[in-house]
Amino acid sequence: MITEIMKQVEIFTDGSCLGNPGPGGYGIVMRYKGTEKTFSEGFNKTTNNRMEMLAAVVALRKLKEPCSVILTTDSQYVRQGITQWIHGWKKRDWKKADKKPVVNADLWKQLDAESERHKIDWRWVKGHAGHRENEMCDELARTAAENPTQDDTGYPG
């Protein structure tokens, strides 16, 4: 019996926002078999949390097949949201315990859908603490935020 072995991919993400809300960007470092690729994009008006989430969505979307992923973020919002809070939100039809709509539900739904395709180990690293890939992502995200080219169509402001 032949068992398909999933590719092992490391993903590092970060989001940045100048003002919050304000111009924002995301940075991604992806590593597969020792080869690194970087991605970034800037948006005219958004929030830091939306950029943190979008970084993870975009990175997972770039994987052409189901993979075993270690995804490292400095955002507790993203890590806790996708591993803990989302289960209750889905049961309550994307409402929080206080019955208010989940903020950034558009991106949570996308992140949930992308996550379903992969086996993901969600990891947290302290930001601005000398973690090589996190620092790379931070620089990519800040540079993108300083040079925005896109509109965040999901941001209500």
Curated annotation (Swiss-Prot):
- List its EC numbers: 3.1.26.4
Mind telling me which Gene3D superfamilies this protein's record contains?
Answer: Ribonuclease H-like superfamily/Ribonuclease H
| Cofactor section | Mg(2+)
The residue stretches assigned to a coiled coil in this entry are: none
Which catalysed reactions does the entry list for this protein?
Answer: Endonucleolytic cleavage to 5'-phosphomonoester
Q: Which UniProt keywords apply?
A: Cytoplasm, Endonuclease, Hydrolase, Magnesium, Metal-binding, Nuclease
Protein encoded by which gene: rnhA
Residues annotated as binding Mg(2+) 1 are 14, 52, 74
Spell out the protein name for this chain: Ribonuclease H
Respond yes or no to whether keyword Nucleotide-binding is given for this record. no
Residues at which Mg(2+) 2 binds: 14, 138
